[in-house]
C-alpha cells in the first residue's frame, strides 16, 4: 500500500475507519493485532480493557508499541477462537486506533454482527 493511500485512510473519521475495517477484514479474511512473546497487546483504562485491531499490517505498524509486532489473525480464528475468549474476559475491541485516539470501541457481538453482515455480500 502506498503512503498516499495510508495517509488518506488515516485521515478518515473513526466511524469511516470502522467501516473500512469491516469491509477489508471481510474481504481479505484477516485481522491484525499486536503481539509480543508474552501475548497480545491490550489498552484501556481502569474502566475497560480494549483489544486493538486493524485491517492491514501497515496500520498496525503505525501504532506499534515497543517490543510488540503486528501479527496476522485469520478471520475464522478471530471469530471462533479469539473473540469468545475476549467476550468471556469482558474485553471490548478498539477498532483501528491511531496514535491520536482509541478508534471505535465495539463489543464482541457488535463486531461479529457487522462482519457477518458484510460477509453475506461476498456469498
Regions found by a protein language model. Name each.
Residues 1-123:
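Conserved NAD+-utilizing ADP-ribose enzyme module
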Amino acid at each position: 500500500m502506498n503512503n498516499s493511500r495510508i495517509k488518506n485512510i488515516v485521515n478518515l473519521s473513526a466511524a469511516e475507519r470502522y467501516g473500512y475495517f469491516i469491509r477489508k477484514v471481510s474481504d481479505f479474511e484477516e485481522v491484525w493485532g499486536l503481539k509480543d512473546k508474552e501475548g497480545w497487546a491490550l489498552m484501556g483504562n481502569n474502566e475497560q480493557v480494549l483489544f486493538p485491531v486493524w485491517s492491514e499490517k501497515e496500520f498496525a505498524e503505525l501504532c506499534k508499541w515497543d517490543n510488540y509486532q503486528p501479527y496476522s489473525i485469520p478471520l475464522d480464528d478471530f471469530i471462533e477462537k479469539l473473540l469468545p475468549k475476549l467476550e468471556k474476559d469482558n474485553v471490548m475491541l478498539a477498532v483501528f486506533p491511531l496514535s491520536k485516539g482509541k478508534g471505535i470501541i465495539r463489543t464482541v457481538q457488535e463486531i461479529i454482527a457487522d462482519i457477518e453482515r458484510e460477509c453475506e455480500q461476498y456469498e
